[in-house]
Amino acid sequence: MAVISMKQLLEAGVHFGHQTRRWNPKMKQYIFTERNGIYIIDLQKTVKLIDAAYNYMKDEAAKGAVVLFVGTKKQAQDSIEEEATRAGQYYVNHRWLGGTLTNWETIQTRIKRLKSLKKMATDGTFDVLPKKEVSLLKKSQDKLERFLGGIEDMPKLPDVMFIVDPRKEQIAVHEAQKLNIPIVAMVDTNTDPDEIDVVIPSNDDAIRAVRLITSKMADAIVEGRQGEDQVDEKTFEGQKSEAAEGDKKTADNSMEDIVNAVEGDNK
């Protein structure tokens, strides 16, 4: 059984790519057709590639891999933080600071500063300092927390990265490439897939699509580390019945029929 059924992908709008004038020709192999000036992603391929990504992430997690989730666009911020945390991993969901990976030692000094400020806030140090100084220190703490809070406890450089919209996260992609860190990513029709090790062709702008796929990558990590029985039950709620229903329906329908059926609800 597929990790995510065709029905679930359709309901989340995973199949909607970008306008045809904003495409990367290298994504042609993942595009099914064009509708009203918008590319439609071939979900039959997406289903298989999600399975491949899930198995890859699960296998890496079983080896104890450190995984960094990256998604700084508004549609991804909440899902990236929530799912990385649920999987016991790390995340960057606001601006990517240049050198986060390639200048790791310097980033560590900023993380130490963040931890120091947190300690000052809890041990009473702020209570004895002038209000103006405390205000400045709190602003510094908030800024560091915003950009580095998700990697504050990351023990080392990541072994794998999961990225939502690698086109937007170009700096992160290039840093990972320099350090030979494998990338699993949601890749839309306007993105170069050659930069990604494990491609998931997908709409990367819809909140539901981002949450659906990000949650499955988190599930893979949980399963790889703890065993299938330990995966949070809520993540699989209704999945088996939906998948069975979805597979049965899609077995008798072409991709074009499916696109036509849902197009009215998603446009």
Curated annotation (Swiss-Prot):
Belongs to the universal ribosomal protein uS2 family. One of its GO terms (cellular component) is cytosolic small ribosomal subunit. GO terms for biological process: translation. SUPFAM superfamilies: Ribosomal protein S2. Residues 224-267 are annotated as: Disordered. Gene3D superfamilies: Glucose-6-phosphate isomerase like protein, domain 1, Helix hairpin bin. Pfam families: Ribosomal_S2. It comes from Levilactobacillus brevis (strain ATCC 367 / BCRC 12310 / CIP 105137 / JCM 1170 / LMG 11437 / NCIMB 947 / NCTC 947). One of its GO terms (molecular function) is structural constituent of ribosome. Keywords: Ribonucleoprotein, Ribosomal protein. The keyword Lipoprotein does not apply. Residues 225-251 have a biased composition (Basic and acidic residues). This is Small ribosomal subunit protein uS2.
